[in-house]
């Protein structure tokens, strides 16, 4: 499938919904309802929100990656491993009917490209790391590679759910209780930590909405390394 065309099966605009702060389980229930509606002929949607502090585990999470102190974790049906969501992190859930033939790798790359474009627009040298999902800042002599955006999705009946998270001004210490995304030899960062000024969720929400829609519809070209080696790890299909 050419990157110059839409990955969506619908030509109707994506309905962007800014929901504020939503409990994780409530958002998951909303996603499932929107998938049912999309399969029945409804519109694609992009949910943009924040969660109260919560750990969620994808289907590939190993026992040693969970909090050692027994902190509760919500087990999900998405791809990927364990991560944290909470205040100061923008979470996006694209509920999108994919065009045939289904190309999950293409979908993941487009979401990554959208987040890379947002980070680049703020002056950061963001990109991909081969063999690892998400959006990263390169390592240097003082710091390792640092993940600023995470992706974990599910495809059910040809429709995506779950999605991505972009660290804006969240409390990064929340990641210290886990092995985030199963990666022990790299760091986690935020827009605020990298730019040296507070970057709120509200500041980037419009840009994220625009870039995600651009990427899904082919208006934002995808570049960078192939994600074939890890796409199966961040996506779960049914």
From Swiss-Prot:
It is found in: Cytoplasm. Disulfide bonds: none annotated. GO terms for cellular component: cytoplasm. This is Octanoyltransferase. In the reaction, the free carboxyl group of octanoic acid is attached via an amide linkage to the epsilon-amino group of a specific lysine residue of lipoyl domains of lipoate-dependent enzymes. One of its GO terms (biological process) is protein modification process. It holds the Pfam family LplA-B_cat. It comes from Mycobacterium sp. (strain KMS). The record marks 147 as: Lowers pKa of active site Cys. PANTHER family: LIPOYLTRANSFERASE 2, MITOCHONDRIAL-RELATED, OCTANOYLTRANSFERASE. SUPFAM superfamilies: Class II aaRS and biotin synthetases (SSF55681). The active site is at residue 181. Catalyzes the transfer of endogenously produced octanoic acid from octanoyl-acyl-carrier-protein onto the lipoyl domains of lipoate-dependent enzymes. Lipoyl-ACP can also act as a substrate although octanoyl-ACP is likely to be the physiological substrate. One of its GO terms (molecular function) is lipoyl(octanoyl) transferase activity.
